Each structure stands twice: as C-alpha cells, then as structure tokens.
C-alpha cells in the first residue's frame, strides 16, 4: 500500500509518498516513492510497553478517530553488531491504514520521559535473553 506523507518528516522533507514492505512481525521496510530513501522500521509493541496519545493536530491531519485502523512503527538505525542499533521511540510514524496517510509524530519528551530519540536495542535483547 502507498501512503501519502501528510507532514514533512524532519530531515527528509522531500518524501511525499512511501510504501511499506513487511519482513516479519518485528520489521518493516519504509520505501520512499519520491527518492531513494529506505528506512528499517520496527513494531515497538513487540519489544516493550509503548503507549502514547496521538496529539489532536495529528489526529485531525491523518483523519484519525476511535474506529480508525492505525499502525505505529518506529525508525530503527541498523548497526553492526546488531546490539548497537538504535530505535527512535520519541518520534513514531503513525499510519492511517484506512485512508493511506502517514506522519511522523514528535512526542513531547516531558510527557514521555521513557521514550528516547536513540535508544539502544540491546536494552531489549538482553531483557529477552534473561527471561
């Protein structure tokens, strides 16, 4: 499915349309249809508790209501070794699957102090190993 970018993605303002390619329950490839940009996205709910309120501005922009089918994914920077990879939890990508729109929502760090811009995935890999 092609998604229309409704608000510029910081640092990637030229991206107007994107396509998602699912790898598995954890990972999704974010492919720009406007240029050659490709991101690896991760389903945050697979690795940690992750809950936030989509701000009213973005709910209106993406036409989100209580019945809307939404998808939340986070940008992951893949590194070698994998334990040094990072995830951006403070600025999730919110997809309205019903109307094919997306925006990156930069959350208020004061309201969500547990969400970081570059959180190491090792924090979650080690947790899974110890359980």
List each language-model region with its residue ranges:
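Residues that recognize and position ribonucleotide moieties
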Residues: 52
């Amino acid at each position: 499915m092609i998604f229309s970018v409704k608000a510029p993605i910081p640092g990637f303002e030229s991206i107007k349309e994107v396509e998602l390619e699912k790898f598995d329950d954890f990972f999704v490839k974010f492919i720009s249809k406007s240029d050659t940009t490709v991101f690896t996205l991760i389903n945050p709910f697979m690795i940690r508790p992750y809950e936030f309120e989509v701000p009213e501005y973005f709910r209106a922009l993406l036409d989100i209501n209580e019945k809307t089918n939404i998808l939340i994914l986070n940008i992951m920077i893949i590194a070698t070794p994998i334990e040094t990879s990072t995830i951006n939890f403070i600025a999730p990508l919110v997809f309205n699957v019903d109307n094919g729109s997306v925006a990156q929502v930069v959350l208020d760090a004061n309201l969500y102090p547990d969400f970081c811009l570059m959180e190491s995935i090792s924090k979650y890999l080690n947790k899974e190993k110890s359980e």
